[in-house]
Amino acid sequence: MAKKSMINRDIKRTKLVEKYKVKRLELKKIIKSINVSDEERFQATIKLQALPRDASPTRQRNRCALTGRPHGFYRKFGLARTKLRERTMNGEAPGLSKASW
């Protein structure tokens, strides 16, 4: 089980990412546009840097929904490998079964 503080920190980051998502996209669009002057591009870059660091989506971490484990995470199920295996063995994961050949 991950520390509650780490799980809460990731939840806080997720909220910040959602809050600033539109603003970040607009600023990035200005920065990448070739029709914008250098001064406007520079101002957009400064505004982007002024946004909170945790508002960047790359600072988010995928975590298991049950344990908060950050490694061995399967996006399709939202679970870490250990919990996914437990669910599979109990028949709780739809479409999964232990391989045998």
UniProtKB/Swiss-Prot annotation:
InterPro entries: Ribosomal_uS14, Ribosomal_uS14_bac/plastid. SUPFAM superfamilies: Glucocorticoid receptor-like (DNA-binding domain) (SSF57716). Transmembrane segments: none annotated. Gene3D superfamilies: 1.10.287.1480. The keyword DNA damage does not apply. It comes from the Bacteria. Pfam families: Ribosomal_S14. Keywords: Ribonucleoprotein, Ribosomal protein, RNA-binding, rRNA-binding. The keyword Membrane does not apply. GO terms for cellular component: cytoplasm; small ribosomal subunit. One of its GO terms (biological process) is translation. GO terms for molecular function: rRNA binding; structural constituent of ribosome. Part of the 30S ribosomal subunit. Contacts proteins S3 and S10. Binds 16S rRNA, required for the assembly of 30S particles and may also be responsible for determining the conformation of the 16S rRNA at the A site. Belongs to the universal ribosomal protein uS14 family. This is Small ribosomal subunit protein uS14. The gene is rpsN.
